[in-house]
A protein has these predicted regions:
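Acyl-donor (CoA/ACP) binding surface of acyl/acetyltransferases
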Residues: 1-35, 65, 69-168
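Short, P/G- and charge-enriched loop/turn segments at secondary-structure junctions
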Residues: 1-2, 53-56
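Conserved GNAT-fold acetyl-CoA-binding loop/helix
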Residues: 33-53
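Short loop/turn motifs at secondary-structure junctions and domain boundaries
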Residues: 56-62
């Protein structure tokens, strides 16, 4: 799934993921600090199926894959994904900002833009799964009035997760 045109904010724009973004994304996701709370495998557990899935992200029929880019210098600073459910009323999101750009307001601006985009696409609910220990991400979702829907434990990475929901 792809958007027809970039989503443009004050400091960032969100564009469709392309194969040229693969190395940036995998370096960020596999980084021990940056990828700590992600559900992606660590580099040593990446298999052929995962590699194929990453290769196919740019043209996935099941979800949107985005790159977050700074307007001032065109630097890639993060990734974002969004998966509509079968009713196309609920969209589940995930995001990762490169650690060099943490605590600079980019995730806030990005989430605001994605919420606005989701509203224009007629989604009624946004869900996001976040590690309970990922305080910055939990606070970001709280800032936008996401509410905890349920808590679970993800055995693979040994973190309790919260699935949060926002009705829009």
């Amino acid at each position: 799934m792809r958007i027809k045109s970039n989503l443009v904010g004050t400091n960032i724009y969100i564009k469709n993921y392309e194969l040229a973004d693969k190395l940036f994304c995998t370096n960020m996701w596999f980084n021990k600090v940056n990828g700590k709370y992600l559900s992606d495998p660590t580099e040593e557990f990446v298999d052929d199926n995962y590699c194929q899935a990453v290769d196919d992200m740019y043209n996935s029929p099941n979800g949107y894959y985005f790159i977050i880019t700074r307007i001032c210098d065109n630097s890639r600073i993060g990734s974002f994904c969004a998966f509509p459910d079968e009713t196309e009323q609920i969209i589940d999101i995930g995001y990762c900002i490169h650690q060099l750009y943490w605590r600079q307001g980019y995730a806030t601006e990005c989430l605001k833009m994605i919420i606005e985009w989701a509203q224009t696409q007629n989604f009624t609910t946004i869900t996001a799964e976040v590690a309970k220990d990922n305080i910055a991400s939990c606070k970001l979702l709280e800032k936008f009035n996401f509410k905890i829907k349920k808590e679970s434990y993800l055995q693979k990475i040994s973190y309790e997760h919260r699935i949060q929901k926002l009705y829009i």
